[in-house]
Amino acid sequence: MDRRDFVYSFSAFVAGSWLVPRRVSIATRLDRIGLELYSVRDAMRADPERTLAAVRAMGYTDVELLWSFGNFGRTPQQVRVSLDKEGLRAPSAHVAPEILIAADWQKSLDTAKLLGHDYLIVPSLPADASRSLDRWRDWADRFNTAGATARKSGVWLAFHNEPDHMKPIGATIPYDLFVERTDPSLVRLQLDVGNMVMGGGDPMQYLERHRDRYWSFHMKDVLPDRSRDTELGKGNVDLRRILAAIPNIQRKPVYVEQEGPADPLASARLNHAFLASMNF
């Protein structure tokens, strides 16, 4: 079944009459909740082992690694040991776009398998590349090529949205161009719901339009003026509605991300508690 389980309740019209089924939706909570380690990047720089232990103690089951930060100075083997020690899973990592066109792309895919990644996700394109529709097209084609190699290794390549991806170039929204030009059988998408809102987009509309493309999610709340993110439940993003709209959600990584909290570990704890208690 999709995301929700259903049960049938029956009532008799009269004794001995036909029984009429009535389908009743059962409220759902997330089985697993991940944390994007960018949310606690300073703590990870200072003491990655202690930080991962704290993240697990909060109740998080998954983390999203940051290859783009060099995994905070640790080798893939060290990261693997740390994850196993804490009982954490790392379904994905954020990687720099240049890794797709490097000569050792296959080596990166092998490392992804070592770390248990299902996805390598590019968070954004180089600044100079994102100002031109032609460069967006070029990168979409590179994603298709790199994605084909990734699929042969059992890994998915994916793309994450930033607020400025929604800023039109001429009459075209570059994010839309990228989604339309990439091959769904080779490239998946990670929806950052807060970034979508801050960029002026509607996460629900994109979920409806590309429901089969989104396989990973950043849950992020946003202040009413859309100036920055905030703790979950303190902004105006309808997270419950979004979660309820995601098909097969228990099969898809869902991460908390808050980019600039005053106390990152305290906010991570509050965000987990909020999301873990949410019925949808």
Predicted regions located by residue number:
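Active-site acidic/histidine proton-transfer and metal-coordination neighborhood
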Residues: F10-S11, G16, D62, S82, ...
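Glycine-rich, proline-tolerant flexible connector loops at the mouths of alpha/beta enzymes
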Residues: E64-R80
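Histidine-acidic metal/acid-base catalytic patches
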Residues: R4-A12, G16-L19, R23-G34, V40-R56, ...
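Active-site beta-loop-alpha junctions enriched in small/polar residues
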Residues: Y38-V40, L66-G70, V95-E98, L125-A127, ...
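Active-site mouth loops of central-metabolism enzymes
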Residues: G34-A46, H94-I101, L133
